[in-house]
Amino acid sequence: MEKFRVLDVSGDVGLEAYGATVTEAFVNAAAGMYSLITNLEAVQEKKTVTVTAESISLDGLLVSWLNELIFHFDTYGFIGKGITVDEFTPSLTLPPEGVGGEKSCRIKATVSGEEFDPGRHEGKLLIKAATYHRLKVEKKAARWEINVIFDI
């Protein structure tokens, strides 16, 4: 199954990611985003970081998740290659913290990769942020589909 594809968006860049589960679609969206930054074949899994994101909605969780990964790249130069989801809570039905708009959607993952090295890693796009513009996280037939636009 195709994991993701790049969307042609005027002035920005978009991504459509797929997965048999919503968790797999989130992982594939992150992999697709990293592939927009550099060629992942050159990235080695030398180091791991734990990345956590929360939101009150599944759409918001995706944006928070991708922006947290962008933060690690912008701040530490960390580019991920392997992603293992340790915890994924995609619903708003958690008691009691899920009541009253609390952040009840959550993802926690171990991301393996290394610091970006311009001598070894091809620089493609500088992604500023994942946006809510045309954002979509939905189940279609036998798979989950994600559409996300990145500010560049």
Question: Where would I find each of the regions flagged by the language model?
Answer:
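N-terminal intrinsically disordered, cationic/polar leader segments
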Residues: 2-90, 103-152
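Glycine-biased, low-complexity coil/linker segments
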Residues: 95-101
